[in-house]
Amino acid sequence: MRPKRLLLATALVCALAPGTWLRSPPPPRALQAEVRLTPIETRRVSRGPFTLVEGWELSGDPLRFGGFSALVALPGGRFLAGTDTGRRLEFDRPDHGRRPGVFGPFESNETAYKNGRDLESLAVDPGSGIVWAGYEYRNSIVRLDAALRPGEEVFPALMADWSANSGIESLVRLSDGRFLAIEERPRRWRGSRHMAVLFAADPVEDSEPQSVVIDLPAGYRPVDATPAGEGRALVLLRRLDWGVPPGFDTAIAEVDVDSPNADGIVAARMLAEFGAAIPRDNYEGLAVTEDADGMHLWLISDDNFMSFQRTLLLKLRWQPREKARE
């Protein structure tokens, strides 16, 4: 269990009775690839420009399934989710059918990238299907082809001193072809400013990216991002709630890399704090789809491999012209 997960897990179980949180099934001999998506009951509630539409609980291999830290929408109505144990989940949109998802490693040899398999972020070119994966510990970006075969890996110098355990938590290919990587850790303890790197094009090809400072709402940390048109991105935010029992708060903010303030800092604009409007969990993946009936956001949660948490997938209607939270 990596340090960040251990800290979160410890906080979450401290108020629970002993014996209620460990996964009990023994590990299977081989990884179980099939993943089931089961609808859950939801209430149609709105926060800012977002309205919860549907939700599903995902379940699979009793020991290895979980830990999702990133989500992207692939061409052809499919999704790709990545885990911080270096595995992937491919699945069809559950609102278009009930086919099971397929869970497995990014490479057939699970020892690949053993020293730093902590995948925390994904980005995709919707035209070609090429995917980029951001890895903590290594502070690197790996490019995968449309068949999801890993290829070139780069170690950007501007990310070299990012925290090994709170590094490239967000990576997004902006609508204009640029890439934005955001460090999870703030520059100062309990601060709101985060280092980021802006690539003019494919990060594997761009050897001279630009350093950026992003100011996010206080108390929240960035955990994923998705394109929102031109130089804008929606950033998924998480905050640990130290109540009894402890849990997580989820919010979404918007950043525009082309609109820095007078100090050169890109200030995020809060769009929504969800509170109890969505099922409460540790949401770490965010993707967007443009559909015939409008725009939708998709959130996936990280269960931290704890039996009292779930892997949830939520679908939210996004109406960009609706007023954001002031």
Indicate where each model-derived feature is located:
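Sequence/structural signature of beta-propeller domains
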Residues: 2-326
